């Protein structure tokens, strides 16, 4: 009897998706030696080579390519088995793993969490804050049940349910004469001082799209990891930055910072809930989207 384990198949799937032992280990949430050891054990049990190692490159063998669809189906069935017990129970009960991007989490969660607790007291919510690419990967691997991010999301295996629109404003140093007469046109030369989040944050790409006709000269000098850091830099006169409306209320209370609008039509992003295109947790995700859409949008923008 071969006796493959679920863990070995999960590691195999991660390595097949990434073709890189380090990235596969990160996706699986284990150390690289642990993943390598389990892959080697899997090859020993199957009595065949699954991956060709050549320096930093990894290539799947013909045997591995033939096995991949079957292993993916097995793992998908296992994930469905793990959640089948929820069927027939009230919606949103038990463990639910939700991801959310950093430019939404601190502003949305304080409003969403009390509502979820009120409606679904048996819900065991597990939160993960990460950039969109990481949330997509975790959802693909079955490590998240759903996530909240900004569209567009181009993965055809995802269902996306729009939640709300979030307009963009500018955060500028208080007293800056370049912004004395708002609203600000997107082509304003003053936006050359635009500061951006580091690579990987969708807000960075959205800022570049909004101010695409202006070259942000400060971009190379500053790559902040959080919106809070960017706002502190703006308050110290180092530049300006794009800020979502849901963050503008709290930011307006900062000293030496001013929030100004763009010219109409104001740019905006659409925030959505996304989950895998299957029926396992579909009803629960629809219920979650309904709760979030039911929030008072004026409260979110406050």
Where are the regions that the model predicts?
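Beta-alpha-beta core module
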Residues: 154-162, 166, 180-183, 188, ...
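Central regulatory/effector-binding core of bacterial HTH transcription factors
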Residues: 93-156, 224-227
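Interdomain hinge and pocket-entrance segments immediately C-terminal to HTH DNA-binding domains
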Residues: 6, 56, 86-105, 119-123, ...
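Short helix-boundary/capping micro-motifs
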Residues: 13-34, 47
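Hydrophobic hinge/microswitch elements
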Residues: 131-144, 149-150, 198-260
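Secondary-structure junction motif
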Residues: 178-180, 184-185, 192-214, 281-290, ...
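A short LG(V/I)-centered, amphipathic sequence patch enriched
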Residues: 43-60
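A late-sequence structural motif
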Residues: 108, 257-300
């Amino acid at each position: 009897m071969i006796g493959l384990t679920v863990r070995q198949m999960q590691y195999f799937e991660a390595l097949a998706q990434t073709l890189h032992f380090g990235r596969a280990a990160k996706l699986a949430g284990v150390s690289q030696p642990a993943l390598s050891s389990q892959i080697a054990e899997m090859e020993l049990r199957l009595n065949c080579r699954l991956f060709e190692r050549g320096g930093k490159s990894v290539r799947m063998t013909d045997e591995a390519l033939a096995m991949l669809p079957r292993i993916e189906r097995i793992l998908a069935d296992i994930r469905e088995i793990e959640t089948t017990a929820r069927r027939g129970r009230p919606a949103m009960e038990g463990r639910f793993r939700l991801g959310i991007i950093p430019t939404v989490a601190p502003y949305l969660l304080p409003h969403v969490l009390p509502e979820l607790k009120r409606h679904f007291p048996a819900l065991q919510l597990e939160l993960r804050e990460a950039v969109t690419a990481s949330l997509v990967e975790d959802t693909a691997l079955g490590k998240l049940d759903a996530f909240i991010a900004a569209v567009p999301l181009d993965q055809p295996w995802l269902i996306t349910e729009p939640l709300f629109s979030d307009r963009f404003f500018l955060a500028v140093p208080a007293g800056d004469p370049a912004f004395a007469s708002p609203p600000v046109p997107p082509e304003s030369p003053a936006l050359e001082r635009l500061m951006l989040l580091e690579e990987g944050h969708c807000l960075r790409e959205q800022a570049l799209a909004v101010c695409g006709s202006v070259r942000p000269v400060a971009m190379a000098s500053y790559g902040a990891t959080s919106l809070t850091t960017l706002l502190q830099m703006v308050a110290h006169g180092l530049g300006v930055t794009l800020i979502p409306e849901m963050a503008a209320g709290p930011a307006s209370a900062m000293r030496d910072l001013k929030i100004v609008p763009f010219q109409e039509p104001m740019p905006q992003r659409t925030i959505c809930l996304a989950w895998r295109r299957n029926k396992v947790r579909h009803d629960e995700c629809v219920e979650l989207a309904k709760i979030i859409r039911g929030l008072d949008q004026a409260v979110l923008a406050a």
